A protein has these predicted regions:
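Peripheral terminal and linker regions in Fe-S/redox and tRNA-modifying enzymes
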Residues: 2-644
């Protein structure tokens, strides 16, 4: 659906020239895959609905089935993991193989993390049931974790069980293919795409085509480093935070033609960059965006000097070195290559076409109304519910604390989806779940059902909805227990009983190391894990950032605060900063504007005593133990496998 009145012909940000506006003009746009690529790229020249020996992938345009399942991969994983456990296969060779199937080593020996990719966060009720069953059977901690890239991860899985788990999840159409390693990672997007007021069109079919085009693509199997892509649903809103990604697509319409602005070279970690504009407008329906994307990844894949230092092997490093204009020249040259005429960029074989509206729930004959709990429901309604552009429907955002769900919650959510959404939901980059196509009349019943599962909290994407990565709970690169700190901060914020509307808009995020998986760079108040040496002992600590932003189409990285706070003092620091903001701000002044006006030194001065040295003794022993842990803290960092 594309409302004519919403057509956007205005010039987007970036340099304007005809070369940028029309990449690869005159280049061939169709063809067939070369024979040596047929086994892995048949989806670029055909779309069989049922598997066969020649075309084993099955493409189904049903919710949650974006990535075609290839069952031979499960057989291969069984075989190779058995060989490895018998000592018949080299460890490094097996690790590379394992990562492509989304099975990742943890800081704990002999167990794995299984990462299931959910393109644009899409998941259906049967798949939530499959997660519940798999977690009960194979995951010792009995929980699954929604990540900041809309995946679901399961931790502490023994290798033989990981082989069984990915196969059983595959039976439900869930894929971990290329969930790890130097591959095309999960493609993320706005969880409300297709339902938003102000949308030019639904980006979902085009994002789905992108996923299908590049999964198992020969060029993306062993790149210098991982490659992350995101699709926005609305250019000026960008709830997918596309600008921090390696490759970003933002929707536009020009002259009635659907297209995207293409940005490339974003990223966080120790070298944060906002992706600059490569092309202001690239067409979608003719497959031009797939052609441009392949040119980009081909250049990235063969830039071998990036492989010399894996800490600086992302595409942002290349663009930082040569500049976006020089990179555009490389793309234009790449688009003249012979490979272009050997490809079929038609979207017909790979588009993810599914009419959600046709399957949306009917209006109920009767429905419950608030009874003695109106205040709590009104809070939920104000913060978690958003009206869809389709009359009579809304989306409901479920707050999932720390992104963790237990089997009963997976199953309960599945049943709510069946009863009230037509079966539609998507995870978010904030570790929540958005229920789509909920009838306006059914929202109260949905809230009551969510509350029975412990998932009825109000405050979605507000100050109490704290985001963090797994940290030292499982990650080899983790320095601190970011999940433990998340819980401590969330509990402190709830105790503060914050009712101020401007304060509730503050976003707090943390990562267990500088890499940024917890999005600390773009939070209003962000932290990353560090440490403080006290003689032979070590205190878990955090480095704060202030003033980050990602809403309203703007991305800004926060400013580092010159303080190293012991982990156990971080909740106190947050409370002081919030009270400082509430007492000293101007009328209607947002938190980031306040930070910019008063400066970070003012914030530093208010926690100076919290950053003072701590003597190691029995009275202070608590500071030397991390949140949610019961042993003295020490920095134990392994070698991350994401760049193996």
């Amino acid at each position: 659906m594309e409302p004519a009145s919403l057509e956007k012909d205005s010039q987007p940000p970036g340099q304007a020239n005809t070369e940028k506006a029309n990449p690869g003009q005159g280049q061939a746009n169709a063809g067939s895959a070369s024979p040596d690529e047929a086994a892995t790229s048949h989806h670029r020249h055909g779309s069989p609905k049922v598997g066969s020996l020649e075309h084993p992938e099955r493409i189904e345009n049903v919710p949650g089935h974006v990535i075609p399942i290839l069952r031979q991969e499960f057989d291969d994983f069984d075989t190779e993991s058995t060989r490895f456990l018998r000592g018949e296969l080299d460890g490094e060779e097996f690790t590379k193989f394992r990562l492509k199937q989304g099975v990742y080593g943890q800081r704990q020996p002999d167990v794995q993390m299984v990462r299931v990719k959910l393109p644009l966060g899409g998941v259906n009720p049967d798949q939530l049931d499959a997660f519940a069953a798999g977690i009960e059977e194979y995951v010792p901690l009995r929980k699954g974790h929604i990540t900041t890239r809309q995946n679901v991860q399961m931790h502490h899985v023994p290798l033989p069980d990981a082989a069984k788990l990915i196969r059983e999840l595959g039976d439900a159409g869930l894929s971990s293919r290329e969930g790890c390693g130097n591959t095309m990672r999960n493609v993320t997007g706005d969880p409300r795409a297709g339902t938003l007021e102000g949308e030019l069109f639904d980006i979902t079919p085009y994002a789905g085509a992108y996923v299908r085009y590049f999964v198992r693509h020969p060029t993306t199997q062993s790149m210098p480093r991982k490659f992350k892509t995101a699709f926005a649903a609305i250019y000026d809103e960008d709830n997918a935070i596309t600008r921090i990604h390696d490759l970003a697509f933002l929707p536009l319409v020009r002259g009635g033609v659907r297209g995207v602005e293409v940005r490339v070279g974003g990223g966080t970690s120790i070298m944060p960059r906002i992706a600059p504009t490569l092309y202001e407008f690239v067409e979608l329906d003719n497959g031009e965006y797939l052609k441009v994307a392949e040119a980009i990844v081909r250049i990235f894949d063969r830039t071998d000097w990036l492989r010399a230092n894996r800490a600086r092997a992302r595409i942002k490093v290349l663009i930082d070195k040569i500049g976006i204009d020089a990179f555009r020249d490389l793309v234009e040259e790449e688009l003249t290559g012979d490979w272009v005429v050997e490809r079929d960029f038609s979207l017909d074989p790979v588009r993810f076409d599914h009419d959600e509206e046709a399957n949306a729930p009917a209006k109920p004959d009767s429905y419950a109304t608030a009874n003695g709990d109106l205040r709590e429901f009104d809070e939920f309604l104000a913060s978690n519910v958003r009206r869809q552009r389709q009359a009579g429907f809304c989306t409901v955002e479920v707050v999932v604390q720390r992104g963790d769900l237990i089997p009963d919650q997976f199953r309960g959510l599945a049943q709510i989806m069946r009863d009230y959404t037509g079966g539609y939901a998507r995870t978010t980059v904030h570790q929540n779940l958005v229920l789509r196509w909920v009838r306006d009349e059914a929202v109260y019943e949905v809230w009551r059902r969510l509350s029975e599962l412990g998932l009825g909290d109000a405050g979605a994407q507000e100050v109490t909805d704290v985001v963090s990565c797994p940290g030292t709970d499982s990650c080899k690169l983790g320095i601190t227990s970011s999940m433990g700190l998340n819980q401590a901060i969330q509990e402190r914020l709830v105790e503060m009983q914050i009712e101020d509307e401007l304060t509730r808009r503050i976003h707090i995020k943390m990562s267990g190391c500088p890499n940024g998986c917890g999005q600390h760079h773009i939070a209003n108040i962000g932290f990353y894990g560090a440490s403080i040496k006290v003689g032979e002992h070590t205190i878990p600590a955090y480095i704060p950032h202030l003033g980050g932003a990602y809403e309203g189409g703007e991305v800004r990285y926060g400013e580092r605060v010159k303080a190293r706070l012991p982990a156990k003092r971080v909740p106190e620091a947050i409370e002081r900063w919030i009270r400082f903001y509430e007492s000293e701000r101007s009328d209607g002044e947002e938190f980031n504007a306040f930070v910019a006006r008063v400066g970070t030194p003012e914030f530093e001065s208010r926690v100076k005593d919290l950053a003072m040295p701590i003597e190691f003794n029995l009275e202070n022993m608590n500071y030397f133990v991390d949140w949610s842990k019961n042993v003295p803290f020490e920095v134990i960092r392994g070698e991350g496998e994401c760049a193996v």
